[in-house]
Each structure stands twice: as structure tokens, then as C-alpha cells.
Amino acid sequence: MKQPLHLINPTVKAAAVFCCVVMLSFIYNPYTPACFYIIIVAGVLLAAGIPLKKWLLFTIPFLILAFGCVWTAAVFGKVPTTPDNFLFQAGPISINSDNVSVGISLGFRILCFSALSMMFVFTTDPILFMLSLVQQCRLSPKLAYGVIAGFRFLPLLKDEVQLIQQAHKIRGGAAESGIINKISALKRYTIPLLASAIRKAERTALAMESKGFTGSRNRTYYRTLSVNRRDWVFFCLVLLLFAGSFLVSLCFAS
């Protein structure tokens, strides 16, 4: 059984993420992104069924990036140190509360962006997302089905690489060891992969044309996606949670 977040229309989900990213870009206090990040993580873990271990594993790079932003803003911030905002002295570097606040705000903003992105990626089928863009956002079917076909080709290209590697071994080619040798071996794989991709794309295009695909928007769909009440409830709930985070931040700021 699919979790609630998996059932939301992909376009509505993307619109909610985009609105949150835009609004967070204009929030400079550290309390709003911190509160909103906690809400995002709790909501995704409860409503998407994502394992905590998997979430933490993908969060590690963004934690490192966020810590780098906090450190950079605290050490190299432009706000001058005064007796009112002075925190401590680290050798020749004076750390003040204003620069630390800016750094924490940037760090939590990065974590919010990453959490929203992972929520979308982990709970959205790419094929359904492209179909939703065609049906709800009037995206060109030619572009959408081209992207879908390219996405379907990715596993095939992986199999092609394995076949080329096995063919080289049969013909006496030495196995690549080390990063430099593997990078140089890519040159031998590029032309066969490119030729295979062109043949697959040509066959796919001919098959689509033979079945009557013209790229027109006036067509029927095997799988129809719609925006229903559940999707609007999700969109409004996300905006309300963001507004609630902002109101909570006002209480902390005061």
C-alpha cells in the first residue's frame, strides 16, 4: 500500500516545494527554517514511510555543507564585532552573535532545501511527474515523452557497458584497475554506447510514429492524472505549516 505522500499529484507536490523554496529565500532569521526543517523531517518520515537510516545517509552531505556555511559566516561575516554582540575570541578572529545567527540561518535554509528535494525525489515517480506536467501544465508531449524515453534507456545503457566490458575481457583486454585507468577506458566505451543509443532512439521514434504519435496536445492518455481535493489539502497544509513556523519564529525573536 502506498504511503500518503506517494499519492499526491506530482505537479502539486513540485509547486508546494517551489513555493517553500521561494519563501525561505526571503527569510533571514534562523528560527523559521529551523522550525520548518523539523516539521519537514517529521512529516516525511511519518507520511512517506522512508527509513530513518536512508534519510540520515542522504542528509550527511548537506549537513557538512550547512556546517561549512555556519563556519564561514561566523568567521568571515561582514557584521563588525561590538561589545553588545561579542561572543568569544579565537586567536585573531572575533566571533559575534550576529554573524553566527546569519550562518545558522543559511545552514538551516540549506537543510530545508535538501529535505524538500529529498521528499520530492523519494515520493515521486519520474514517469508520473512528466505525465502530470503534460496534463496539468501543458508541457509539450514531444519533450515529455522524449525525457521519458531517455529515462527508460538508462538501465539499458548500464547493461551495454557491462556487455562491452565482457567483450573486452574475452578479447584479452586487461581489467581496469585504478581511477586513471577506468577514466581512460571510458574513451573505448563512448563510441559503442553512442552508436547503441542512437539506434535505440531511432527505433523508438519510428515505433512512436507508426502508432500515430504526432506530438499534438489534443490526444487521449492511457493514464490520466488529475488534481483532486487531497492534493489541494496537501498544498494548503504545507503553506500553513510554513506560516506556523514563521509565527513561532516571531515568538522566539521577541
Swiss-Prot record:
Function (record text): Part of the ABC transporter complex YkoCDEF that could transport hydroxymethylpyrimidine (HMP) and/or thiamine. Could also transport other HMP-containing products. Probably responsible for the translocation of the substrate across the membrane.
GN (gene name): ykoC
Domain of life according to the entry: Bacteria
Subcellular locations according to the entry: Cell membrane
Family statement drawn from the similarity comment of this UniProt entry: Belongs to the CbiQ family.
Residues that span the membrane, as ranges: 7-27, 32-52, 56-76, 110-130, 232-252
Listed GO CC annotations: plasma membrane
Membrane topology label: Multi-pass membrane protein
InterPro entries according to UniProt: ABC/ECF_trnsptr_transmembrane
Quaternary structure note: The complex is composed of two ATP-binding proteins (YkoD), two transmembrane proteins (YkoC and YkoE) and a solute-binding protein (YkoF).
Organism of origin: Bacillus subtilis (strain 168)
CDD domains in the cross-refs: EcfT (cd16914)
UniProt keyword terms in alphabetical order: Cell membrane, Membrane, Transmembrane, Transmembrane helix, Transport
Protein name: Putative HMP/thiamine permease protein YkoC
Coiled-coil residue windows: none
